[in-house]
Design a protein with these regions (language model features):
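Intrinsically disordered, low-complexity repeat and linker tracts
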Residues: 1-32
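Solvent-exposed, well-ordered loop and adjacent helix/strand elements within mature globular domains
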Residues: 21-174
Length: 174
């Protein structure tokens, strides 16, 4: 699907904000399974994944990462830290909006990518669990009842209806 672009100009700040979304193709699996990995398993302090998951700096951006007390998922602002298959992108820090068939949405920030050897031919989902989204969590804060699948929690319950890649930046006018 083509990009949708919104431009706004503030007469006070002389800044143009550009927001672009691109809806990406979905695999044939439902994406209902939403697995997780422990964020502290990423130990290479020089890696982009480590920077995003641990309040580091990558490509000139410093991330302020926290753990959501309700879900145990690592977060950067309003974005849940997650891995996707390389079909959806490989640049750490890329942001996405996921819409479920229940109408609920949640936002994720790419902190890691699934290994191509563990994904389908198009690299959209993990072959073993058929998961599209894999959250990064604090192992000590996973809620009871998750049992390996965040689809069991209300905010994430449902099949994936769409994934949109988000781009947002501010540019000062000259």
């Amino acid at each position: 699907v083509e990009n949708r672009e919104t431009k706004t100009k503030s007469r006070f700040s002389h800044t143009v904000t550009v927001k672009t979304t691109k809806t990406l193709k979905l695999p044939k699996v439902s994406g209902a399974c939403k697995t997780y990995a422990y964020y502290d398993a990423v130990t290479d302090k020089t890696s982009p994944a480590y920077a995003v998951l641990n309040s580091g700096t990558y490509r000139g951006v410093t991330y302020k990462t926290t753990t959501d007390e309700t879900t145990g998922i690592r977060m950067v602002g309003e974005y849940y830290c997650a891995a996707l298959g390389t079909f959806y992108g490989t640049t750490k820090g890329t942001k996405y909006k996921v819409t479920l068939d229940t109408g609920k949405t949640f936002k994720i920030i790419l902190c890691d990518t699934k290994s191509n050897r563990h994904t389908d031919k198009k690299h959209q989902y993990a072959k073993k669990n058929k998961d599209v989204v894999e959250f990064y969590v604090d192992r000590t804060k996973i809620p009871a009842g998750v049992n390996g699948n965040y689809n069991r929690l209300e905010p994430f319950h449902g099949k994936i209806q769409s994934i949109e890649r988000l781009t947002e930046w501010d540019r000062a006018e000259s």
